[in-house]
Amino acid sequence: MASDDIVVGLDIGTSKIATIIGNTWQSDPEKIEIVGVGKSPSEGLRKGVVVDIEKTTASIRESVKEAETMAGVQVGSVYAGIAGGHIMGHTSEGVVAVAGEGHEITKSDVDRAINTAKATATPVDREVIHVLPQDFSVDEQEGIKHPIGMSGIRLQANVHIITGAVASVQTLLKSVNNAGLSVEDIVLEPIASADSILSIDEKSVGVTLADMGGGT
């Protein structure tokens, strides 16, 4: 069965740069068939941060080319992983009034609450990478995971915001762009690892995942 599209992950690490290409299907969005992998020694990075754009770009090209050859496709865009000591996280809250008929909470209300939390002052030298909803409060009821469909006057979103240093994020993007690739999105590497390895039950109970990379 022919795939509908391809998805490409690019792991820009301190010791190596890895590329993975997968086929995807709209009929089964959870399914990914790995068709190409590539890796190259990482040049131009120190502890996960690009310190030499030209060398990093060359390493990216080498890794992507190897994966393209295996998959028999040409890559135009990637999801790029990011890590490093410049990554920081903080919690934030966003509160909105529920304005729908009967004060029933909709997805629009949830999105507004999350965006309000995201809009809290972020220093000019920081760039938001992820906004991760933790839970919600409806009026006086706390710890709600899925508020859509509930009724209330006041909706509060409690989120965890992950940011990176603007200079480090933009330098990473430039290195990828210089390799002839656009970036679909930036993903924090520990989150990517957790989503690919841990089960829902493990995340719910609580587990520690340690990624011992070259820059650790």
Predicted regions and their residues:
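Short, intrinsically disordered, charge-balanced linker/junction segments flanking boundaries
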Residues: 211-216
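Nucleotide/phosphate-binding catalytic cleft detector across ATP-hydrolyzing
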Residues: 1-14, 20-210
